[in-house]
Amino acid sequence: MLPALKKGGRPRDALGRFIRHHERLPVSLADTRGVLFVVSEMADFIKAGGLGDVAAALPRALRHRYDVRVLIPGYRAVLERAGKVEIVGRVLAHAALPACDIGRIVQSDGLPIYILLSRELFERDGSPYVSTSGSEFEDNAIRFATLSHAAADIAAGHAGLGWKPRLLHLNDWPCALAAGYVRWSGGTTPCLLTIHNLAYQGLVPYSMAGALGIPAERVAELEFYGQMSFLRGGIVNADHVNTVSVSYAKQITGPAQGCGLDRLLAGRAAKGVLTGIVNGIDASWDPRTDEYLDSHFSVNQWQGRQDNAAQVRKAFGLRESTGPLFAVVSRLVHQKGLDLICEVAPQIVAAGGQIAVIGGGEPDIERQVAELTRRYPGQVGAFIGFEEGLARRMFAGADFLLMPSRFEPCGLSQMYAQRFGCLPIAHATGGLIDTVDDGVTGFLFQHASVEALRRCLERAFRTFRLPGLLAAMRRAAMLRPSGWDVAGNKYLSLYERTAAIAPALATVS
């Protein structure tokens, strides 16, 4: 029963608050706040990179305002960790894309997860994208077009879930084609596409258009230098596009970092539908309570950092030292500037520093790192692979993080390091510009060159010899706001902006 109206027509408080609240909301989200967060990896189950961390954190950060549900492929690793999966819906075949059941689980914190089930497409060993041998799955186009089409079917209410979202949030090229499938079928569900790394575009030959169910008259939307790009199709058809940092959103509109899509992205920016939002990091990254640390510490109590440094030196076979400890927590690839680190390593060692490296990647760079450990025993140590507990202890014990990435859409390692009082030494690009305050919470250098990195290292060594300045910078880094509450609030606003772009949605039942 609605509250009674006062004589004279003004509503009583409860109804008045309801009306005033809903008058402020976009009409497209006033009645329901369902969002389908479509992603190809999620750290709860399987992770190939930073996207998996974002997918695990962002939907949870938004659930206080939206009914956010996640859609992810049913990889073998997902099914092993999911436990009992309830079949709740089904998407039909489309062109060469097979029909798939949709399973559902609910995480312990209440987050609903839809799992796209296909033994043929997803139940394999390896990562979401490559086999155990490191080669891409040959049918990735079919696999991720199936995921995208399933998202569009759910948005249209055709999957039998008894629920459909008012907005699709699509992540990177594996999900980007969903925006196209929505539009090509006459749908009006607003689509937000988040680009986590523009370099990965989902390129496939034109000959696959029919198999993917792309209308002949729309193939040009995907055209990319003689191939089709899933990501380009998403950029063209999404209502709004965002990247994972403000600076990266600007940089990709130019040829240097636009990866061949700069003119298209510049056009979207000119229309006000390209935005940058810096990622957050999970609250579990807390040096006072982190489960991976034997010795905890805070901005007011530093002893635990020294204990962690000793553990890191022991784990990497480094000698006891009072000099600075430099950490490298990264994929060992050219993009991350590992070749630059290999070039400056002799300077670091000569100045009394030590280096601990964890990660894997390009065989040539792995060999260069291994050679450094042989050349400088006790001063350079490496673990080829990844182990999260060890990585966290490195952040908690090292003095500096080396991060000379040639490009970095956002980057998470620098924020993890800052939270633990480890100062990033980073190339001024993308999200590193937005998250590292030069001389305050870390150090930036302007050009991805050996000489620029050397000059920045000299600044870091000078700071290390000034304990008061070093402590002040550590405190500033640890206190820098980097939680998902900040990023989450910006995504809430972006959801409402994106929904407002498609006013026809209000008429969809």
UniProtKB/Swiss-Prot annotation:
The keyword Cell wall biogenesis/degradation does not apply. Pathway: Glycan biosynthesis; glycogen biosynthesis. ADP-alpha-D-glucose binds at K47. Its EC number is 2.4.1.21. Keywords: Glycogen biosynthesis, Glycosyltransferase, Transferase. It catalyses: [(1->4)-alpha-D-glucosyl](n) + ADP-alpha-D-glucose = [(1->4)-alpha-D-glucosyl](n+1) + ADP + H(+). Pfam families: Glyco_transf_5, Glycos_transf_1. One of its GO terms (molecular function) is alpha-1,4-glucan glucosyltransferase (UDP-glucose donor) activity. Transmembrane segments: none annotated. The keyword Nucleotide-binding does not apply. GO terms for biological process: glycogen biosynthetic process. NCBIfam families: glgA, PRK00654.1-2, PRK00654.1-5. Synthesizes alpha-1,4-glucan chains using ADP-glucose. Belongs to the glycosyltransferase 1 family. Bacterial/plant glycogen synthase subfamily. This is Glycogen synthase. It comes from Xanthomonas oryzae pv. oryzae (strain PXO99A).
